[in-house]
Amino acid sequence: MGRPPCCDKAGVKKGPWTPEEDIVLVSYVQEHGPGNWRAVPVSTGLMRCSKSCRLRWTNYLRPGIRRGNFTPHEEGIIVHLQALLGNRWAAIASYLPQRTDNDIKNYWNTHLKKKLRKQQAIGAIFAPPRPSEPTAGHADCRRHDMTRSSKDSHAACPADSTPAADEVVTQLIAQQFAATDGDTSSSSSYSYASSTDNISKLLNGFMMKSASPARDDATDTIKTSSAIDIDPFDHKSGGAALPPPKKRQQQQHLSSIENWLFDDATEQLVVQLMEEISGGSCSVPMLLY
């Protein structure tokens, strides 16, 4: 068993203090000072134990003790120290010299504890909800959505923005220019009939003295060459239209014949025509072969 309390000894008085006992205790403390509480009962003749004398002086009789309601500043200190020190009321009272540990303990148990719980409950009710942290599943779904959206954006991009598409477009443009050049060369080839027409006109000057049949044949040749020039043009559209494949082959064939006639036998034909005109005979229809 533990040590028995001193108040349980025989001849020790319990209960509330009387005013006479308070006066005796205050007189002794003023004369000797607070400290040696074991000598107080023997020196003063009080029928109280040393602990009862100490608590009576500390909590009631010492000067500077403040009574009454606690200020908000004192309440804040008590709440803060109680959270740090716990229920060590004597240590808490050392930070509030004007308050006793007994008063602080009673005020905490009767007022502050209930008030603090009420404030915490109200704060929990009216506090804004905390943003929930995304779980692993939500993060994966969000990452999947972002990847899908990026793929969709790449798919929605125009095809001509890729290098392969640029090469295809370049090839198509090159083919188009090649076709245009081919058409230009073909048009120049079958427009060569105009130069042949000029040659026929030139030869017509030498053939003025010849007979009318030769003139008619030359006229037919000119009409044939001019017909070749007029056919490629569309009068309805008003623009140059490409001749069909068969006509193009015929025109290329005629152009080769005309080149041969113009390049190789022009001089020979002129000489023969001059001889035939001078001799009275005309063989102009040879130009048609």
Curated annotation (Swiss-Prot):
The keyword DNA-binding applies. Residues 127-162, 225-252 are annotated as: Disordered. Transcription factor that binds to the promoter of MYB31 and MYB42 and activates directly their expression, thus repressing lignin biosynthesis. PROSITE patterns: HTH_MYB, MYB_LIKE. Keywords: Activator, DNA-binding, Nucleus, Repeat, Transcription, Transcription regulation. This is MYB transcription factor 69. Mainly expressed in highly lignified tissues such as vascular tissues. It is found in: Nucleus. Disruption phenotype: No visible growth defect but increased cell walls thickness and higher lignin content. Residues 9-61, 62-116 form the HTH myb-type domain. It holds the Pfam family Myb_DNA-binding. Residues 139-154 have a biased composition (Basic and acidic residues). It comes from Zea mays. GO terms for biological process: positive regulation of DNA-templated transcription; regulation of lignin biosynthetic process; response to auxin. GO terms for molecular function: DNA-binding transcription factor activity; sequence-specific DNA binding; transcription cis-regulatory region binding. Residues 37-61, 89-112 bind DNA. The keyword Transport does not apply. GO terms for cellular component: nucleus. Its main location: nucleus.
